[in-house]
Regions:
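Short glycine-centered helix-capping/turn motifs at secondary-structure transition points
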Residues: 3-6, 59, 94-97, 184, ...
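Hydrophobic/proline-rich hinge and linker segments of small-molecule sensing/allosteric domains
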Residues: 42-47, 115-138, 151, 223-227
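Short beta-strand->loop
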Residues: 33, 115-123, 127, 169, ...
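Extended ligand-binding regions for polar small-molecule ligands
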Residues: 1-29, 66-75, 132-156, 160, ...
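Extracytoplasmic small-molecule ligand-binding "clamshell" domains
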Residues: 7-10, 14, 25-113, 163-179, ...
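A ligand-binding cleft/hinge motif common to bilobed small-molecule-binding domains
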Residues: 88-95, 103-114, 158-161, 179-217
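Membrane-proximal, cysteine-centered motifs at transmembrane boundaries in secretory-pathway
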Residues: 170, 175-180, 197-198, 220-225
Length: 255
């Protein structure tokens, strides 16, 4: 069903939002029609990965990624139905094509087989976290320790290739991984600075510290769309540079 000129104008008036007329998003007729016919997008999220994304005690989706989704809604009119769960379940649902996209995800070779990644909105350092008394000098030494990892996490995918004999202790969330180390059930956790700061402050895990940066490049966080959904990907990819330029600093300061 084609879109009439009047309908097109109405959709643009209602949905094509811009902070500044100069920066309005030029969506094609095909993209506008796609939005009209697919207004609600099923998006997968990690329920416990603050400050990037999490579900608060009232059941609301919060965090840096949620701010970007709200802005995509303002720019395009797309609405997001958030399916938040532990990360392993979220990744599995995405692979099974139960979800349209992910809100906040690191690119890996495995994920590139079934996802198209947008422009990154954040780069983060990966760090090695352990109890204060643990003497660990360099990244290569982690092969001698029990390493807490979140199932399905990019860190696990990287480590298993480099150190296939590491003893992994699996956690369903970052919070659980920090607790495993804090309570002595695992020796180290490889995570990132913002998540560590958030949990140490909130959960009072004062016996943990960052030992050093992990032997990884910085991790880029992006949104990712299921392969085969080219129009949705093109819309998100078109909007992200505008949002990043206008709002990135404000969002990062807030979180």
């Amino acid at each position: 069903n084609d879109i009439s000129d009047n309908e097109k104008k109405e959709i643009q008036k209602r949905w094509v939002f811009s902070f500044d007329e100069k920066n309005s998003i030029n969506l094609t007729e095909e993209e506008l029609l796609w939005i009209k016919n697919n207004p609600i997008i099923k998006i997968g999220a990690d329920a416990n990965w603050p400050p990037f994304e999490y579900v608060d005690s009232s059941g609301n989706y919060q965090g840096i990624a949620s701010e970007y989704l709200n802005l995509i809604t303002k720019y395009t009119g797309l609405q997001f139905e958030v399916n938040a769960d532990n990360w392993y379940t979220t990744i599995s649902k995405t692979k099974n094509k139960e979800l349209d996209m992910l809100a906040c995800v690191a690119k890996t070779a495995d994920r590139e087989e079934y996802l198209d990644f947008t422009l990154p909105f954040l780069s983060i350092d990966v760090v090695v976290i352990a109890k204060k008394e643990l003497q660990i000098k360099n990244f290569d030494e982690i092969k001698n320790y029990k390493v807490a990892v979140q199932k399905g996490n990019f860190v696990y995918e990287n480590l298993i290739k480099k150190y296939p004999n590491i003893e992994f202790i699996f956690a369903t969330s970052n919070k659980e991984a920090f607790e495993l180390v804090s309570y002595g059930k695992a020796d180290v956790f490889i995570g990132n600075m913002p998540v560590f700061s958030y949990f140490v402050e909130k959960e009072m895990l004062t016996n943990l510290e960052i030992k050093f940066k992990a032997d990884f490049e910085k991790i880029d966080l992006s949104m990712a769309v299921l392969k085969g959904k080219e129009t949705l990907f093109n819309i998100i990819q078109k909007v992200m540079p505008e949002i990043i330029e206008d709002e990135k600093e404000k969002i990062n300061k807030k979180w």
